[in-house]
């Protein structure tokens, strides 16, 4: 079981905060982190953190590498999330344009606005 403090440390790291992840990376159970991220709809967000870990803590990752099948699965899910976000953004933009052409002032209240608060807006699960 992953310690809650390790999860919150990792989430802070994913938010872009400068956190020493060396001890966490050395001991983390990647499958448990994947399960947690999946249940919380944070797969894309956490994958961005993992990509950052690969750059900043490569030596620690060599000591505790993620299994290839898990990495490929996670990468695939992250790509699906990015594609979904692109589609939702296009649809929201078209809807906005249609409403404006009809003379309506509008504001589309969709979760995509929340994505702007993420370090990478395309990593937020669009919830479709």
Annotate each predicted stretch with a short phrase:
Residues 99, 115-118:
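Conserved nucleotide-cofactor-binding alpha/beta core module
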């Amino acid at each position: 079981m992953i310690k809650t403090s390790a999860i919150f440390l990792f989430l802070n790291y994913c938010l872009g905060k400068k956190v020493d992840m060396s001890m966490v990376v050395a001991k983390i159970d990647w499958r448990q982190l994947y399960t947690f991220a999946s249940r919380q709809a944070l797969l894309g967000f956490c994958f961005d953190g993992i990509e950052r870990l690969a750059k900043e803590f490569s030596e620690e990752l060599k000591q505790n590498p993620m299994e290839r099948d898990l990495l490929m699965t996670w990468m695939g899910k992250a790509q699906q999330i990015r594609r979904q976000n692109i589609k939702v953004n296009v649809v929201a933009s078209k809807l906005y344009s249609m409403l404006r052409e009809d003379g309506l002032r509008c504001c589309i209240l969709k979760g995509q606005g929340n994505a702007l608060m993420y370090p990478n807006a395309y990593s937020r699960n669009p919830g479709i």
